[in-house]
């Protein structure tokens, strides 16, 4: 298991993802505990990109419950179809929000959050949670994030 990440803040966003993905693969290799793997993915993403908040919400009894995360304290439960996370879960799709204040029904867990990306987390064909990433900058996330974060969370279903 890798104990340290080689973090480079130089290069394009895509180059940073390409450098990080094999390191995440090494972190996950041989580890079967879901919580440990989710926690390490959060830590690796936070360390590489220094986002305001990165974490998982896991499906439990028809709502999303806070899982491993990096960042300030967060909302603990989100109903299906509510906010960005609940909407991503209900629609079974990635949602990129350039300005969270413009998203109908946004759940403001932290006022410093300005933009967000949420991706469904699958186990086989079933959604078991979502990856939620927040930035304190407007329009921080784009299709590059969607592509590479999808690749990263697919590693969790391997």
What are these regions (language model features)?
Residues 59, 63-109:
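Regulatory sensory and allosteric helical modules in signal-transduction proteins
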Residues 122-135, 156:
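Sensory-domain boundary capping and coupling elements
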Residues 33-36, 80, 113, 144:
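A generic structural signal for residues located within well-ordered alpha-helices
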Residues 115-122:
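A short, aliphatic-rich beta-strand micro-motif
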Residues 21, 25, 135-158:
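Juxtadomain coupling helices with adjacent low-complexity linkers
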Residues 1-68, 151:
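Intrinsically disordered, low-complexity terminal regulatory regions
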Residues 53, 118, 130:
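Short hydrophobic/aromatic beta-strand element in the GNAT-like acyltransferase core
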Residues 48, 108-113:
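Short loop/turn motifs at secondary-structure junctions and domain boundaries
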């Amino acid at each position: 298991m890798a104990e340290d990440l080689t973090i480079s803040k130089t290069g394009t966003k895509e180059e940073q993802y390409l450098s990080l993905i094999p390191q995440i693969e090494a972190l996950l290799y041989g580890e079967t505990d879901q919580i440990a793997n989710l926690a390490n993915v959060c830590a690796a993403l936070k360390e590489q990109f220094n986002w305001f908040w990165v974490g998982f919400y896991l499906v439990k009894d028809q709502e999303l419950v806070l899982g491993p995360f990096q960042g300030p304290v967060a909302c603990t439960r989100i109903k299906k179809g509510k906010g960005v996370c609940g909407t991503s879960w209900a629609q079974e799709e990635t949602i990129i929000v350039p300005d969270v204040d413009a998203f109908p029904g946004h759940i403001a867990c932290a006022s410093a959050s300005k933009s967000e990306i949420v991706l469904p987390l699958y186990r086989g064909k079933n959604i078991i949670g979502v990856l939620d990433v927040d930035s304190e900058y407007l329009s921080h996330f784009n299709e590059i994030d969607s592509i590479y974060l999808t690749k990263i969370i697919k590693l969790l279903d391997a």
